[in-house]
């Protein structure tokens, strides 16, 4: 970066030579300080003196997480290389004015320095300046070793150390020690800076033309690369040991080394140096404190260095290198699917019916990582916009410097050749002469500087606001991530419960299927029912046979008992016979003993007795045989009687049923008889009344009654005679049925004889006929009473039989 001309107060009396000096701070290179007596040239540094120190210690976690909550070791990349030989031959001229030439560097390296300086209030400033020094002619590019591929978010920490100023600048140019001593001597007062500000404006015209051409070429060759990786740099307590307790606080410095603005393009026309920082307020030129305006400007430059965007345009800041485009496309393709899953289709992927393997939860976590990376890319782009604004500020500063340097024209090499030996001889004195610059031009530059400072302050405030917004968004995203993790864990639990429930349901289904498989079908049920009917019929048949066999067994038992009785009787007879035979044998023995004494008559008697006994025995055997035959005959008779008994039982059952029907008919008949009795009572009362009337007035009836009344009486008697005949027939039928006889069919069917019809045709109303009919009616009442008594007796007998059977 171009060194900024500082404008202290005019009046450089402390410097004897009257020349202005540049403080060897963060924005100034020693190339601006030419010698007084001889031409200074950039000496080439040998290849063995190149500082190419790479100190890289990174332990990245390959667990697949987003890097949040993990920390990696320090990653300090120090690339300080120099290559090629610098040849600078200043043009000679008669004008003896010092010139400030900007020498292009041929080195191509990516310089990343992390330095830390303490502010006066004790806070730590951790800044990261990534600069690129490249060959302008070749346009070589050297990228960091960490930018080879896309990786998830990592935490990087680098220790910024308080280091002393190095004796070698980052472009690899070594300057004489005398020049540095002269710088220290010339920086002891303010007039040196004012002399340099009012230095002749015509000396640097040629060099500024070269710078403009080189800037155009630089703007053509700008490109950017994209690497989605953060480096979280923090301070380590072991490396930074400060005596004061206030200096022990550590701050987290996030340097986005993976973003495009943190990887500047290597060009040979610009020399961006990363000087060593000192504490603001303690920087001095030769031990003298810097003015507040200078301190403000230096502080602004330090703020610009925290997140620099070096050598970028708006279009180039979002462009990708050719080798990174396919990786970016793959990353976008890989992150589109997670976005769809988590936004729209993630609710469908949680449907419980399938209940897939739990390995898919890992894919969901990877999807979340992809979302976080996309969020980080958006944040990076917003930070790129902020850095683009910083770039515009730097461009404005460059324009201001170019305008200031444009006034230094007609600067010849002869003056420089005359100045260099004078500068080398006068080591303790400053040999610059200050020429007065036009006051209005100086005021205009100061106004521009103030406006740029104001813009820088505004941009810094805006940057702080955006950083705070980004931090809040990051916290929100972390909270959302935690809630999503909790939600995922709850979903896992739910899935486990549902899987267990499904297993239980599956077990139940299997048991039900087994049960249904064991159940018989309709054909089986029908066949079993048929078998059951067949078995029932067989069972009935077997029961009947069993009953028959039991009956036969009882009969056989009875026969056996009878036979046993007979056998006992026969045994008794046999015993009697045996006793008689024994007695006879004894008698025979006695007879044999006394045979001499027995006469012949006794022998004949014994012979006859034996014959009788034999006859008796034969008759007894015949009797026994006859008795056995009788027993057999009786057994047959008993069997026949048993069959008859069964038949009689069946007939008895049928008769009982018939009797039940007859009882029902008898009940109906009794009801009819009661009704007839009531009617007969009424007729009797009417007949009694008529008989009394006839007896009282037997003669005057025919004379007094009119013809109409006689016909009515005839009709009444006719109907009464019909009722009397029917009642007689009914009483006779009931009596016959009660006695168990067959009823008279003519009476039952109501067939009347001719005599009855002849009697009915008679219209004799004589007292004899009336008395006869009255006697018939009385007889009918008696018959009805008898019938009632028989029916009641029969009913009482039936009730008694029913009670006995029950």
Curated annotation (Swiss-Prot):
Positions where Phosphoserine occurs in the chain: 15, 207
Keyword set, alphabetical order: Coiled coil, Cytoplasm, Cytoskeleton, Phosphoprotein
Region (Disordered): 1-27, 51-89, 101-146, 308-353
Organism superkingdom: Eukaryota
Alphabetized Pfam families for the sequence: CC4_CEP85
Claim: Membrane is one of the keywords in the record: no
Composition skew (Polar residues), residue ranges: 60-74, 322-351
One cellular component term from this protein's GO annotations in UniProt: pericentriolar material
Any coiled-coil regions, as ranges: 442-644
Principal localisation: cytoplasm
Biased composition (Basic and acidic residues): 135-146
NADP among keywords: no
Gene knockout outcome: Knockdown of the expression into neural stem cells of the mouse neocortex causes a neuronal migration defect.
Compartments reported by the entry: Cytoplasm, Cytoskeleton, Microtubule organizing center, Centrosome
GO biological process, one term: neuron migration
Function as written in the Swiss-Prot or TrEMBL entry: Plays an essential role in neuronal cell migration.
Family in the record: Belongs to the CEP85 family.
Protein name stated in the entry: Centrosomal protein of 85 kDa-like
Originating species: Mus musculus (Mouse)
Gene that this polypeptide is encoded by: Cep85l
